[in-house]
């Protein structure tokens, strides 16, 4: 969910030590953190959409079910860090150092050569040049997803909807690894 009208400063950190923290179900959308130490922290079901984490340290951290869309990790350091069931799209990894970092069942769209080389021996991840095209969504599923635009929370979370009238096909690709089109057509309208 976007932080429109909310205080983004609560998740903006500069030169801080945030050790052993649990950032579960947090929204770091459009926040800015610089030179911050997040060692031994857990990030679960967290959104990092358009967030900046420049020159931050992530030692012994775990990221589960997170989305990194347009996130900037320039100069950050990841050591003994695990990423599981995460989506990476248009993420900046300039000058990032990875040491003993593992990715499991992650989706990468538009990844740099640096990340592709890192993932070369990890075959349980999906690496694509771009998210699937909009026309790959079946008309019946598109109709169900469009009907959910009336739900303000779902629409602002960008989980199913992109900018304008587009559909977030990256999330749909992840959902299709678990559910069929028919199951999604049946289950998505049940979201409150």
Task: Explain the meaning of each model-derived region.
Residues 1-4, 188-192:
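Short amphipathic alpha-helical segments
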Residues 133-190:
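Charged/polar low-complexity intrinsically disordered segments, enriched in acidic residues
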């Amino acid at each position: 969910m976007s932080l429109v009208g909310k205080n983004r400063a609560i998740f903006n950190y500069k030169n801080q030590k945030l050790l052993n923290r649990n950032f579960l179900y947090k929204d770091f959308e459009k926040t800015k953190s610089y030179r911050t130490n997040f060692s031994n922290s857990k990030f679960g079901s967290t959104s990092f959409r358009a967030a900046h984490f420049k020159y931050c340290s992530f030692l012994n951290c775990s990221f589960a079910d997170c989305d990194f869309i347009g996130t900037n990790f320039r100069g950050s350091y990841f050591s003994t860090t695990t990423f599981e069931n995460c989506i990476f799209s248009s993420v900046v990894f300039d000058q990032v150092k990875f040491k003993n970092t593992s990715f499991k069942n992650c989706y990468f769209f538009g990844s740099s050569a640096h990340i592709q080389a890192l993932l070369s021996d990890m075959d349980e991840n999906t690496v694509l040049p771009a998210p699937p095209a909009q026309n790959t969504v079946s008309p019946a599923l598109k109709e169900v997803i469009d009907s959910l635009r009336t739900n303000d929370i779902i629409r602002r979370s960008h989980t199913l909807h992109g900018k304008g009238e587009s559909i977030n096909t990256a999330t749909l690709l992840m959902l299709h690894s678990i559910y069929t089109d028919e199951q999604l057509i049946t289950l998505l309208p049940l979201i409150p």
